[in-house]
């Protein structure tokens, strides 16, 4: 039972991190669609702040043993790729 609870906590922690990553992607989409251009300092600051916050969340979860370091890095890498593709699509308009 204890190992099931540990697995459940690990799964829940990773799911919460994925939700936070998706929130960042949605926030940047809204910003690009409605508010600012990717070259705008406000856009860059929001993106940097959000990515830094997520990286700290992931680091904390890794240190607690709730998320594997590789999985955390993969999550950040995937988000960075998605944001890059979004940026490229926006600037190609």
UniProtKB/Swiss-Prot annotation:
Superkingdom in the source lineage: Bacteria
- State the SUPFAM superfamilies in the record: EF2458-like
Q: Which Gene3D superfamilies match?
A: SO2669-like (1.10.287.750)
Pfam families given in the database record:
DUF1507 (PF07408)
InterPro entries reported in the protein's UniProt record: UPF0358 (IPR009983), UPF0358_sf (IPR036270)
Q: Which family does it belong to?
A: Belongs to the UPF0358 family.
Function of the protein: Essential for cell growth and for normal cell shape.
Protein name, please? UPF0358 protein YlaN
Instruction: Say which species the protein is native to.
Output: Bacillus subtilis (strain 168)
Q: Which gene encodes it?
A: ylaN
């Amino acid at each position: 039972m204890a190992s099931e609870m540990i697995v459940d906590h690990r799964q829940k922690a990773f799911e919460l991190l994925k939700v936070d990553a998706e929130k960042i992607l949605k926030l940047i989409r809204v910003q690009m669609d409605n508010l600012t251009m990717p070259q705008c300092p406000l856009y860059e600051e929001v993106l940097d702040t959000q990515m830094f916050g997520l990286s700290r969340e992931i680091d904390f979860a890794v240190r607690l043993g709730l998320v594997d370091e590789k999985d955390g890095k993969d999550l950040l890498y995937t988000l960075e790729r998605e944001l890059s593709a979004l940026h490229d699509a926006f600037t190609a308009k």
